[in-house]
Amino acid sequence: MAPQPLEQGGAVTSFIPTGQEMAQRQNLIPLGRLIDFIIQRTYHELTVLAELLPRKTDMDRKIEIYNFSASTRQLFIRLLALVKWANSASKVDKSAKIMGFLDKQSMLFIDTADMLSRVARETLVHARLPNFHIPAAVEILTTGSYSRLPSVIRDRIVPPDPITPAEKRQTLQRLNQVIQHRLVTGSLLPQLRKFRIENGRVTFKVDHEFEVSLTVMGDAPTVPWRLLDIDFLVEDKETGDGKALVHPLQVNYIHQLIQGRIVDCTDALAEVYTCLHYFCQSLQLEVLYTQTLRLIRDRLDDHIHVDEYVVGSRLTVSYWRELTNKDPKSELGYRLTIQTDPNDAAKQLAILHVPSIGNKEADIADRAVRSDLLSMERLLVHTVYVRSLARLNDVKTELQLFLKDVEYNIQGTPAMLTVPVLNPCLRAEHIYITVDTHTGMLRCHVPKHLDCPIMPEMQHALNNDWSKLQHLISELRYWITQRRCEKTLQHLPAATQDRLPLIYSHTHPIARMGPHKVFIQLYRHANVILIVELKEKKTCPNEMTYTFYLVLVKPSSVEEGQSPDVLSGQPPQPSAAGGPAPGSDSANAAMPKMYLRVLSMIEFDTFVATHGPGTYIDDPSPTSTSGTSVKRKVSPLDNALSAIGPPLKQQKTIYPAYFIPELAHVVAMCDEKLPFVTLAKEFSMRKIPHGGLQVEANATSLVLKLLTLPQPKPPQAPPTPQQQQQQQQQQQQPGTSDAKSSGAGASANEPKTVHVPPIDKQVWNALLKRLLSVSVRAQVNKSNQTRLWTMELVFYGSPLPSLHHKEQGMRRAVYLQYEMQPVESVSKVVDQLLSDWSKIVYLYTLVHEFREQYNNEKYNLPSMVAIKSYSYTNLLLAYGPNKDVSVNICWDTEAKEFRLVFTGGNSAINAHSMMRDQLQAHLNHNYSLAQVVHMLHETYQPLSSIAKLPIIPHLAILQSPKIPVLSFCIIPQSPTLLRISFQGVYCLEVRFRGGGLCTIRDGAYSRFDRSHVVEEFTPTQGLKGFLSKYVDETAVFRRRSQSEDDNPPSPVTLEDPSAGAGNNGGGGGGGGGAGGGANTFLSGGTGMRGPQSPRDPGLRFAAPLTPPTSSNPHTPASPHPIGGGGGAGGAGGQGGQGGQGGQQQSHMNNFNMTSPPASHMPHPSPGGGLMPSSPLNAQPSPMAAHSPGPSSLSYMQSHTDGSPFAALSPAASNWPGSPGMPRPSPRPGQSPEHKVQTSHHYTSRVLPARSWAGAIPTTLTYEALDTLCRATPHPQKEVPGPELSPLERFLGSVFMRRQLQRIIHQEESLMAITSNEPGVVVFKADCLQYQVFLNPNHMQSLHLKVDQLPMGPMMDGKPPYQWAAQDLQILEQFFDHRVAAPPYRPAVMTSFTRMLNLPAKVLKDFIQIMRLDLMPELVQGNKWNVQFVLRVPPSATPIVPVGTTTILSHRQKILFFIQITRVPYLPNMEWKDAVTMLLPMVYDMNMNHTTLAERREPMPPQLTSAVSAHLRRFSECSVLLPDECSLFPAVHDLLLTLTLPNEPPAPGQMQMQLGGVMQPGGGPGVPGGPGGPMGGQIGGPTPQVVPQVGSSPSPMMHSPMQQMGGGGPQPGAYGGMVGGPGGGPQSGGPVGGGPGGPN
C-alpha cells in the first residue's frame, strides 16, 4: 500500500485531535444533559402514575407510589454521588488525556516503522525510469532553439527574417527623395507652404485648421498619393469640455472620401486642401455660433443677439442694443459679421464691423478667430473696448472745452476716463467715466464718495445733454470740498453742518455770502460758530479759496418773542443756508422751534490768521458793500477775540490733498483760545487782575497770567432745612407784612460764617511777597484725552526747611489742575481755583506762625519734628524717636477745616491714627501747629504702648455666644484723654500729662460722683493696688523736681488783667488751659482749671471734642453727644461772661448745671456740659495766642502730690521771661482747705479701703505704661499659656473672678461665705470650702485653695467622704492651669463650678481624669492621652451650642466632653499625624454606666461606632467594686486599649471622616496644631483630617505628650478649651505653642 501522510488518516485510523481522545474511548455525556434526562424520566413516570393510579385499589396505589419513590430516590442518590465525584474528576480526566496521548504516539511510531519496512522490501524493488531524449533536451535548455526541427513544421510556423535596420534607412531615404521630387516638380498652394518630410511621408499643416500626412507607394510619376493621417486643429476650449470636435468615425469617413477623390485627380494636393479647408471653416463658424448661444443663455441675455447664421458661410451678431435704441445716430446699430471670402474660398474667415473701425483695431479683432483660442467672448470684448475708447475720447474732447490745463487719463480694461475736479486732488476724488460693456451707456462715479448725490444727475447729462456738465462739475467741486472740511475736522473738537437755523437781518453780511458755505460748531463753545465761505478761483476753477467768519450767537426759541428785526419791520432770514422766503407756508412749517440769533460777526484774514502770533482780524462793516474794511463799534467780546492769535509761524508742512490746513488751523486756534477768552472775562468780572492772553517764548503754548489773587473770604455755612422752609414761607407772605418781622426773619435766615483761621495782614503780606507769578495754561490729559486747566503758582523759597530733594531750590512751583468745563461752567473753574488758593493761604497761616516757634531754640521743636515736605498745599511732618512716622496736614476745602492724615513707618502703623479726630478738632479750634507737634511728641510713646493691646473680636463672652466682643476697645475722648474698654465690662481712663507721665483711673466711676457707676461698665476691683505695683516714685519725683528747677515761680499775680485773656476757653482734660485756643503753651499762662478738673494740673491739652462711642447722654460720666465744646477738663471751659475760670470769681460760680461743685470731686471729668454755641464759652484771644510767653513744655509738666488743685504758679506766667512753673496752688474761688487728698494717695502701694479707690488717678511713667501693655510671658515660669500683657492678665483674672461671683449667686448648691480680705471669693459646695484669690505678688492670675470642712454624718447615715490632699491639689492645679487661664471664657468657669456640684464619687473620677490631663506621664502604656474639655468647640457634635458649658446634669445623667489623642506608635510618626477625637460622654448615675452620646443617624461614622462599641463592651465585661463609679475606669480602659479599625495607618497620610465633617488639624506644638497659634488649622506640609465624633479643631491642646522626653506639650492654660497653648521649648516640644481653638 502506498504510503499516506498522517494528516490524512493513513494506517492510523483512530487518530483524533488533541484533547478529544477520551471521546472515543469512553461514552461521555454532559452533566447538564444527564440531569435533564433524569428530570424528564422522573416527570414521565410521575405523569404515568397520575393517569394510572386512580384506577387501582388503595393498596396497589401505595405499592406503586413506594416503588416510584424508591427508584427515583436511588436515581437521584446516584446523581448526587456523580456530582460529588465530579469535583475530583478533573485530575482523572487529565491522567486519561496523558495516557491517550502516549498511546497515540506509540502507535504512530509502530505504524511508521512498518510502512518504511514495506517500502524497502516490496515497493522499491520493482521501481524503474523511462528513456528520455537527452541530446534534444540539452540543446533546447542551452541554446533556446531546436535545430533538428522538420522543414514542414518550420515553413508553416516560423516567419521569415525581417529586413535589417540599414535596409530600412536606405528605403525611407529613397522614399523621401521621391516625395521631394514630386513637390518640386508639381504646383503647390501657398496655404500648404508649411510642411515637413521625414520617414517617407510629407506632413502639411495649416494653422488653426488641420494637419494631414501623405506618401507615395513607388517612385513612378503616375503612382497616386496615399493619404495616411488627418488631424483637425479646430478646438473649442471654452465650451468643448476638452473633447475632440470631430468624431473618429467622421475622420475615417473624410479620410476615405479624400482618398477616393485624389486617386484620379491631377492636382491631388489642392483637392486635399479644398476639402479640409471648407470643413474647418464650417467647423469654426459652428463653434462661434455655439459660444454665442451659450453667452446669451448664461450671462448676456438680450444684450447681444444673433441676427443671421448661414452654416459654412457667415455669422452676424449685434451688441449695445440699448444704446442703439436711444442713440438716433446709430441707425444701423452695432454689429459684427464673421464670414468666408465669397471670391476666394481658400482665404480664412473675415470679420466685418458696423459701424466700421480702423484697420489697426480690425486686425486686432481678427486675431480672435485666428488664434489658438477660438472665442466669441474675446471678439466681443475687444470690439466693445475699441468702441469704448472712441466714446470716451468724444467725452474728453467735450470736457476740454471748459476744463483746460487738466490732466485727463484713459486707461484700464475696461477703459476709464479720469477727470480731476480739484487741485490738488486725490486719485479717489477723480471723476471716473466708463462705458457699460453690456449696454454701451456712459457711467460715472467718484470712488471716495460713492454716495455723492450729484452723480446720478451727471450720469444723465453724459448720456443725454452735455451742456449741463460744466455746472454739475462745479457743484461736485463744492460738494467734495465740504466733505474735505468734514475729513479735516474729524479729529478736532468741531462738527460741520450744511444748515443751521440762524436768524439775522437781510442786510447782514451773512445774507450776501454765496450759496456755498460750511457751518462749523465747536463742541466746547456752544455760543460761537465758524462759517467757511467757499469760492472757486477765476483763473483756475479747480482751486478753492476759503474765507472764515467767527459768529457769536445766542440760542433762542420761538416763544421768547419776535426779534428786533421783525419789530423794526425787517423780516428776518430764517436760515443761513438759504431756505424758502419768510412768510410762506412751507417756510413756517420748516421753521425750527429753536434757533440761533446772530449777535456779531468777525471776518478773518486768512493770511494773517495763519501767520505770526500777532493776528490782525479784519472786521468788515455791515453796511459796507466793497471788500474794504471800515471801523465799527467793537463789543467787549470782539476786543477779547481781537487778541486771538496763533503761535509763531511754523515750518511749512506737506498735507494730504483731503486735508485743508487753513481750516484746521483756524478751528484749532478758536478752540484753543476761546476758553482763555472766557476765563479772562470771568476773571475780569470777579475783579481779579490779569495780563491778558499771551504767547509764551518760542511759541510753546498760550498762557494767561494773573497779577495777584484775592484774599480768601470766610465761607458761608449753607442754610439748614428749617431756614430754607422759613425763607419759602416769607416768600409766600404778602408784601404788606410787618417790616420789623420781615427784617428779623431776614437776619435770622442770613447764612452764618464758617469758623476759619484768621488771616493776619502780616501773614498775607508775607505770602504775597513769596508769590512770584500765577499762570494759567491748557493741557491735554494723555490717559483719557481730556483738556485740563493747569494753574502754576511760583513761590520764592519756603518758610520751612524741607528734607524733600525736590524742595531744595529757591523756585517752588505749585501746579493745580482742573477739568476744562463748558463756557457756561467757567465760573466753577474759577471757584475751584480760588478754593485751592484758600487751601494754600490757610495752611500758610499755620506755617507762618509755626516758623517763628520752629526757629526759636527755646521751644526745641526741631528735635521733636522733622519737616519732610512742604508743598504750600500739604505739610508733611515726621516725628517719633526715629522720625519714622509722619502726619500730613492740609486744608479741606469741602469741610472747611484742617485735615490730619497719619501714616506709619515700615514696621507698624501710626498710633495717633486712633486720635485723629481729636487732634484734628484741637487744631481747628486753636490753629496752633506747635501745640499739635508737642502733643504728637509727648503722646507718641504712650499711644504706641496702648496700640499694642489686642483688639481682636472674641466670641462666647456674652450670654449669646455668637455675638463678637472686642478684647480691648480704645475710645479717644480728647488729644490727651482716652478710655480703654476690656470685653465691654471694664473701663480704664488714661490721661497723658506730659513729662513722661500719665494717669490711669477706673473709667466705670463717674467723674462727678464716686458713688455713681456708669451703666455700661463695671468697677474694676483691685485696680488701684495693681497699678500701684508699677508706680516708680523716684521717676515721678525726679520729673517733678526737674520741672520745678526749670520753671521757677512767676512774679506776676493772678489778679494781673493780662492773665485773664490766657484762661478763656474750655479747660483741658484735667488741667487744660489749651482747650480754648488762646491758653496755649506759648501764651505764657499756665492756664486755669475748670471746677471739675482738680487732679491733673499742668497738662493743658484740648478739650475732648469727640464723645465716647458708648456714651450715655443721661450719665454725668460721659459727655453729651452734642455738647463737646467745654472740653474734658471743665464744664464749659474757663472764661466767658462771668463763667468759671477767667479772673477771680466767687466760689458760688464754680459748679456745673449737671454736677455738684468740683471741690467735692477730686477726680477728672471727661467732658464739659456746655454746648459749643454757649455764651459761657470764651472765644479765642489772638493777643494771648501770640503773646511771647516763654513756657514751652510747661503744659505737659505735672505734679504728683495728690492735690486736687492744679499745679499752678502763685501767679500767672505772663511775665516776660518767666517759664510759668506749675506747682500746687489754690485756684481763684477755692481756698486751700478744700483740698481733699494729699500726695500719699499716689505714692502709697497700700490698697485704699474704699470701693472707689480706682476712681483716684494713679500716676505712671510711660515706661510703666509700656510694661503694662506689652505682651510678656507669665511671671510664674511654670504656668503655661500664651504671651499676654500684664494688663490683660489682670483684667481677665478680675473678669473670671466676677463671673465666679455671679455663678455663686445663681447656683443654689454653692454657698457664698463672707471674707474679710478684699478681693477674695470664698464659697463652699458639699463638704469642701473653696477660696479664690488673685496672686498677691503680681495680681495677674487667679488661684484656688480647697479645704475640707468638718462635717457630720450624711442624711443616709454614712460618714462624709474624706478627700485626699493629693486630689484637692490636683483640683487646685487644674483651676490654675485650665480654668482661670486665657482666653478667659465664662463658660469655662461655669463648667468648673457645675463639676463641683456633682456627687463626691463622680467628682473624684473627674479629678482622676484631670490628673491624666495634667500629668499623663504618671500612667505608662496608654495608647491615648486625654484632655478635659470645659467649653464646646465649633467642631463638636451639635448636642449643645458652641461656646457654652460642657458639663450638663439632668435626670441623674451627666454629659461631659473629653478629647483623646493617639500617642505616636510608629517610627518617625509625629504628633501632627496623630488621630484626635472629641468625645461627648454620658454617665448614668442610676445604672453606673458610661457611654458615648451619639446622634441617631442611619449610618453612624466608623470611629464613633468603634468608641461606642468599646464602651459597651467594657460595661458588659468589666467587674467593678461595690460603690465604685464606672466613669474613670471606662475612660481609663478607653485610653489603654482602644484600637481603631484602620490601624496602623501610613504616617502623615491618615485621612478619616467622622460625623460627616473632615477638618484639618496639626500636631501639638506646631503652628496650626495643638498648641499652635491657629489651633486647628492646617499645620505643616501634611494636613491632618480630624474625625468628627465631636472632633476638636486642635487635638490635645493641654496634653503633655512631649514631657519627660516624650515630645508632648506642657499642660496648656487656655481655659480648658481645646486649642489652648502648646508646649514651650522647655518641655521638650519642637516649638512653643500659642493660643488656639475658637476664641
Swiss-Prot record:
Q: Spell out the GO cellular component terms annotated for this protein, sorted alphabetically and separated by semicolons.
A: core mediator complex; mediator complex
| Keyword check for Chaperone | no
Q: Which residues cross the membrane?
A: none
Q: What is the protein name given in its UniProt record?
A: Mediator of RNA polymerase II transcription subunit 14
Keyword Repeat set for record: yes
| Oligomeric and partner information | Component of the Mediator complex.
One biological process term in Gene Ontology: regulation of transcription by RNA polymerase II
Q: Where is the composition biased (Pro residues)?
A: 711-721, 1219-1229
* Compositional bias of kind Gly residues: 1062-1088, 1122-1142, 1558-1579, 1604-1639
Annotated keywords: Activator, Nucleus, Repeat, Transcription, Transcription regulation
> What function does the entry list?
Component of the Mediator complex, a coactivator involved in the regulated transcription of nearly all RNA polymerase II-dependent genes. Mediator functions as a bridge to convey information from gene-specific regulatory proteins to the basal RNA polymerase II transcription machinery. Mediator is recruited to promoters by direct interactions with regulatory proteins and serves as a scaffold for the assembly of a functional preinitiation complex with RNA polymerase II and the general transcription factors.
Q: Name one GO molecular function term.
A: transcription coregulator activity
Q: Which gene encodes it?
A: MED14
Provide the taxonomic classification: Eukaryota, Metazoa, Ecdysozoa, Arthropoda, Hexapoda
Query: Where does the UniProt annotation place the signal sequence?
Result: none
Where is the motif LXXLL motif 2 annotated in this sequence? 768-772
Concerning its family, UniProt says: Belongs to the Mediator complex subunit 14 family.
